[in-house]
A protein has these predicted regions:
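N-terminal Rossmann-like FAD-binding beta1-loop-alpha1 element of flavoenzymes
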Residues: 2-28
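A secondary-structure boundary/capping signal
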Residues: 6-9, 31, 52, 59, ...
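Short polybasic/polar patches that bind polyanions
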Residues: 20, 68, 147
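Glycine-rich FAD pyrophosphate-binding loop
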Residues: 20-44
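Short, flexible helix/strand-to-coil boundary loops that buttress conserved ligand/catalytic motifs
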Residues: 39, 43, 60, 158
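Dinucleotide-binding Rossmann-like beta1-alpha1 core, especially the glycine-rich loop
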Residues: 45-132
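Active-site/ligand-binding neighborhood in enzyme catalytic cores
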Residues: 121-219
């Protein structure tokens, strides 16, 4: 049986590989001049730079299983190096020391964080008193974060971090299907930050286990 797959991003390439492994003849069609879709690694000044997503989440086994099927599973490593920073207004700024996918877990720390303005830090702290924390049906990541913590936390913390993970705009990313771990952590009745704190306390996950994995040569 011959099968045609349209689009050679990660989904198309993975489907083609699985079908070939099952004995099917596969034709892969791609409109652009390269394969990989959102995933693109370029060499700049001797360094491999990921222009799209630079790692994958380990909470689901599919990506790790695919890497082992491709023969590179033993080469996977957690991203390491200098702490992540965000470029805002012509300067590099540190992320909070404690955060969950960009959501700050210590709101008092925001007063000393150069990434946010004084007004942005004050707005974020309103999360502790605002009612109606639970996500609404079909709500996006951007909608929840802006509603609970304000625009600056979204634009300068959560947006850049999740944009790097998902290679897309977090304002358009469905919370429940796109970032299920944040959706599950935000089910408390009051305060998104406290809800996440309680969620993390109840997790049995090994804290030493990496949240992300990547390949040394880039995705």
């Amino acid at each position: 049986m011959n099968i045609t797959i349209v689009g050679a991003g990660i989904a198309g390439l993975s489907a083609a590989f699985e079908l070939q492994q099952s004995g099917f003849e596969v034709m892969l069609l791609e409109d652009s001049d390269r394969l990989g879709g959102k995933i693109l690694t370029s060499e700049i000044e001797g360094f491999n730079i990921d222009a799209g997503p630079d790692s994958f989440l380990t909470r689901d086994p599919e990506m790790r299983e695919l890497c082992f099927s491709l023969g590179v599973g033993d080469e996977l490593v957690p991203p390491t190096g200098k702490p992540a920073k965000v470029w805002v207004d012509g300067e590099m700024h540190n992320l909070p020391k404690r955060h969950f996918l960009g959501v700050p877990l210590d709101l008092e720390e925001l007063d000393e964080l150069s990434l946010l303005t004084e007004e942005g830090a004050k707005r974020a702290k309103l999360d502790l008193t605002l009612p109606d924390n639970k996500p609404k049906e079909g709500e996006t990541v951007g909608s929840l974060i802006r509603r609970r913590l304000g625009d600056e936390v979204m634009d300068r913390l959560v947006g850049p971090l999740l944009g790097g993970i998902n290679a897309g705009d977090a304002d358009d990313l469905c919370l429940e299907s796109g970032v299920p771990q944040l959706f599950n952590a935000s089910q408390g009745d009051f305060s998104l930050v406290r809800s996440i704190q309680d969620f993390l306390k109840n997790q049995n996950r090994d804290p030493a286990s990496p949240v992300f994995l990547t390949h040394p040569d880039g995705l």
